[in-house]
């Protein structure tokens, strides 16, 4: 009997879209699906490392670049709109050909607007139903366009918790929602086990007394997790490496540049610090446990992955990236994290202020395989 097959493709707008798909793909594999992943570059490298049994198909990404200065980002993205439109058309045509060859039973797109097929159940994954832009008029206009486009998909799956106790505020819980069926999936984290019961929360499935247990001799002051499009990825990497070495404290920085051949490649080190290109999940968990503070962009997937470890979080949103700026402000208001603008960030000041900051624990409801089964059944009704 032929196994059901699924083709899934995450957008290449930061590694988070790929890493959050790992949990979902593993769940599909447990349900007996043959998984095909359409991607390229860094995303392919990190997914191949985590998912050796999946089949990979080459699909070019959007290849978006950011501005060096935040105030330029809207203009830089505006000039890339033709490239984005071309990518949407290209991926749509690519999928029509791939569907004729492989005959997928289900298609899942993580924020790729052209990755759907009219004859096959097609799911769109996003936590941004209300994308925050620099102007309110632009926010409303984009939401109308997005909702109209989402009608081409069978359903929308949202990696968050429905209602007031959510992680992304109005991004995933807007006042007005799309007309297609929605499923709030819970939190996707490749660093924790997927639960098997719909109502389980992470505290019910993980022993918090052991998840943060570490050897004090290996403790570091901070772990810097770098990600996102260039040139901002490199700018943050250099900022954290230089500032950490100036303070002469133990720390680790992960550059967010995975390699197919060297998943745990060490770029450079000295007596106090290490800079890795990327760390596989077990090694990443080890460094998270060792760190007193985690410094990162505050991208949504990173937040989902870090919550179970109950670490003190410091965000440096990508300049001009309104989603991360919104999440940083929201999480700081709830005392879940500290947030600093990159142009004003001073590592010594941030670490001093973090000592006196009253950090609180963000809520976390785990993604569930049983809920996934129910969501799949809804697609075929």
Model-derived features: positions:
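Conserved nucleotide-sugar phosphate-binding/catalytic loop shared by glycosyltransferases and other
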Residues: 2-7, 12, 30-81, 274
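A short, glycine/small-residue-rich beta-strand->loop->alpha-helix junction that serves as a flexible
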Residues: 10-22, 230-234
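Conserved nucleotide-sugar donor-binding subdomain of glycosyltransferases
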Residues: 72-114
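Active-site-proximal region of nucleotide-activated glycan assembly enzymes
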Residues: 118-184, 189-190
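Donor-nucleotide binding loops and adjacent catalytic segments primarily
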Residues: 172-173, 186-293
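A donor-sugar binding/catalytic signature common to diverse glycosyltransferases
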Residues: 283-326
């Amino acid at each position: 009997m032929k196994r059901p097959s699924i083709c899934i493709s995450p957008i290449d707008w930061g590694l988070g879209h790929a890493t959050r798909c790992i949990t979902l793909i593993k769940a599909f594999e447990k349900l007996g699906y043959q998984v095909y992943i359409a991607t390229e570059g860094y995303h392919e490298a990190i997914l191949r490392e985590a998912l050796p049994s999946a089949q990979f198909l080459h699909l070019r990404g959007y290849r978006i670049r950011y501005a060096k200065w935040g105030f330029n980002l809207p203009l830089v993205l505006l000039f890339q709109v033709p490239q984005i439109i071309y990518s949407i058309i290209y991926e749509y045509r690519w999928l029509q050909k791939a569907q004729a060859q492989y005959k997928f039973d289900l298609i899942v797109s993580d924020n790729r607007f052209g990755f759907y097929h009219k004859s096959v159940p097609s799911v769109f994954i996003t936590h941004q139903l209300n994308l925050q832009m620099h102007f309110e008029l632009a926010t409303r206009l984009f939401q109308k366009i997005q909702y109209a486009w989402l009608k081409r998909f069978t359903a929308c799956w949202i990696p968050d918790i429905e209602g007031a106790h959510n992680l992304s505020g109005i991004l995933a819980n807007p006042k007005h929602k799309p007309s297609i069926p929605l499923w709030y999936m819970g939190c996707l984290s490749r660093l924790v086990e997927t639960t098997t019961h719909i109502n389980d929360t992470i505290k019910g499935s993980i022993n918090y007394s052991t998840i943060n247990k570490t050897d004090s001799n290996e403790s570091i002051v901070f772990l810097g997790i770098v990600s996102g499009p260039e040139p901002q990825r490199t700018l943050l990497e250099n900022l954290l490496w230089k500032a950490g070495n100036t303070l002469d404290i133990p720390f680790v920085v992960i550059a967010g540049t995975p390699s197919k051949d060297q998943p745990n490649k060490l770029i450079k080190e000295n007596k106090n610090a290490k800079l890795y290109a990327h760390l596989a999940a077990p090694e990443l968990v080890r460094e998270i446990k060792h760190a007193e503070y985690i410094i990162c962009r505050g991208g949504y997937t990173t937040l989902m992955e870090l919550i179970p470890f109950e670490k003190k979080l410091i965000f440096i949103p990508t300049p001009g990236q309104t989603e991360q700026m919104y999440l940083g402000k929201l999480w700081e208001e709830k005392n879940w994290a500290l947030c600093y603008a990159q142009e004003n960030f001073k590592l010594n000041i941030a670490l001093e202020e973090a000592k006196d900051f009253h950090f609180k624990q963000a809520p976390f409801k785990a993604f569930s395989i049983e809920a996934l089964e129910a969501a799949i059944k809804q697609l075929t009704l």
